[in-house]
Amino acid sequence: MKTLETQPLAPDCCPSDQDPAPAHPSPHASPMNKNADSELMPPPPERGDPPRLSPDPVAGSAVSQELREGDPVSLSTPLETEFGSPSELSPRIEEQELSENTSLPAEEANGSLSEEEANGPELGSGKAMEDTSGEPAAEDEGDTAWNYSFSQLPRFLSGSWSEFSTQPENFLKGCKWAPDGSCILTNSADNILRIYNLPPELYHEGEQVEYAEMVPVLRMVEGDTIYDYCWYSLMSSAQPDTSYVASSSRENPIHIWDAFTGELRASFRAYNHLDELTAAHSLCFSPDGSQLFCGFNRTVRVFSTARPGRDCEVRATFAKKQGQSGIISCIAFSPAQPLYACGSYGRSLGLYAWDDGSPLALLGGHQGGITHLCFHPDGNRFFSGARKDAELLCWDLRQSGYPLWSLGREVTTNQRIYFDLDPTGQFLVSGSTSGAVSVWDTDGPGNDGKPEPVLSFLPQKDCTNGVSLHPSLPLLATASGQRVFPEPTESGDEGEELGLPLLSTRHVHLECRLQLWWCGGAPDSSIPDDHQGEKGQGGTEGGVGELI
């Protein structure tokens, strides 16, 4: 059920028909060269020093035109991580009950860098992200305790809409805060990943400031439809070697992008039984950052982040007419147990041991293909959502035979509609195809044992497909938009409109935008309480939000 794929490699780690012409380096490119001697490369930045950045962030694509099609040139230098092989994990969890005392092994203390690591390549000057060395870090709360509060309508702060209006059929496909909260990553139908910095106005304590429209500091162009994307699990902007993003697109390898320069750092390639390149449908880094888990049809492939290329461990999820069938569409790791969950378009959920991928449980209950998974911080519960399915299901690993409870949301299309939990696990937030954002308090179950809705508001009139809660500030990010298929118009003598085409989208209100909402109290005068629910100051395109 588990095999190791170690086929002989060409010098460039891929067949000749997959190699594009070498790309011209970006002006901000790191001095990496595939044929360069590592001794000639400058040493990496000191671990304790934050990257020194330009006062003006770089706006615009940092990827050369040659990277837009085919497979960008991969780097021969492996990704530098501070983690070795995974430690020994706890014994396999018995059938459907998990021990509450089982936990992931503690990280081993980082030793001194080896000579090879000390002479490794420099990973970029860091001109994309803003320098926060003189400002309070996003993850450092200082003397202020920021907590999410949904007792009032969230206040709109800022957003981005002009960036996505250049193409008439463009729309957002989700957003994700970086693990350290310094920036946010978006995906859209134009096959571009964009990185936005945290609005600098948030650092003006004690001042009334106007929020300007957000502008991306990096654009990373993929060659085709992006299937999935994710941040490195231990990403920190203070350590450039941990600041990168993984993405997978149709008929392309898995790409690792530098979050400071927008350049390609490495590629991971998977091949089918015909030795043809196949794309991953889902991506997830392991909690310790040493492995990248990728979902394929009836298979999960595990790559080592220290060895880019095609070498990987293949873990079958379906064999001998048993197991989890279908494309593995989403993967999530438990924060407290040595296991991970997989959702498939075959409407099933599977639990697997982290160390060897052995199956622990197979669950079913959704009416459509699974599109998103999220674990509760306690590690005992996880949530699942599916396409064309009006239910969010909560599962308890200690009694995983059936859902603990379900919550209602409107999902009427095949689009991936995200949901998220705040860092404490108290609030569950979900988007919907109607545009409404719903909030539940998971710590306050109602009379029937399931959480009661706390708030529901309408940030815009189009589909809200992405929601993401900031890891340390009470900031909610929402992404909107959907693919619209023209509908046939009415014909006949009565009510016929002259000049109206046979196919029309006149009944659809298109709004493609990224928006940030303040969902907390106001310890200082920079975010006053008495402005809750007011129109944001990000421009005339800014949203107000309506209670439902």
Curated annotation (Swiss-Prot):
PANTHER family per the UniProt record, alphabetical: TELOMERASE CAJAL BODY PROTEIN 1
GO molecular function, one term: histone binding
Ranges of biased composition (kind: Low complexity): 15-31
Organism field: Homo sapiens (Human)
More details: The mRNA encoding this protein plays a critical role in the regulation of p53/TP53 expression at the post-transcriptional level; it is involved both in maintaining basal p53/TP53 mRNA levels and in p53/TP53 induction upon DNA damage.
The name this protein goes by in its record: Telomerase Cajal body protein 1
Name of the gene: WRAP53
Family: Belongs to the TCAB1 family.
Recorded disease: Dyskeratosis congenita, autosomal recessive, 3: A rare multisystem disorder caused by defective telomere maintenance. It is characterized by progressive bone marrow failure, and the clinical triad of reticulated skin hyperpigmentation, nail dystrophy, and mucosal leukoplakia. Common but variable features include premature graying, aplastic anemia, low platelets, osteoporosis, pulmonary fibrosis, and liver fibrosis among others. Early mortality is often associated with bone marrow failure, infections, fatal pulmonary complications, or malignancy.
Protein task: RNA chaperone that plays a key role in telomere maintenance and RNA localization to Cajal bodies. Specifically recognizes and binds the Cajal body box (CAB box) present in both small Cajal body RNAs (scaRNAs) and telomerase RNA template component (TERC). Essential component of the telomerase holoenzyme complex, a ribonucleoprotein complex essential for the replication of chromosome termini that elongates telomeres in most eukaryotes. In the telomerase holoenzyme complex, required to stimulate the catalytic activity of the complex.
Predominant cellular place of this UniProt entry's protein: nucleus
Induction, as annotated: (Microbial infection) Over-expressed following infection by Epstein-Barr virus.
Annotated WD repeat ranges: 167-206, 222-267, 272-313, 323-364, 365-405, 411-450
Annotated SUPFAM superfamilies: WD40 repeat-like
Any one Gene Ontology cellular component term annotated for this protein: nucleoplasm
Keywords, alphabetical: Chaperone, Chromosome, Disease variant, DNA damage, DNA repair, Dyskeratosis congenita, Host-virus interaction, Nucleus, Phosphoprotein, Repeat, RNA-binding, Telomere, WD repeat
Positions where Phosphoserine occurs in the chain: 26, 30, 54, 64, 85, 90, 112, 114, 491
InterPro entries: SWT21/TCAB1_mRNA_Telomere, WD40/YVTN_repeat-like_dom_sf, WD40_repeat_dom_sf, WD40_rpt
Residues with Phosphothreonine modification: 489
GO BP term, example: positive regulation of DNA repair
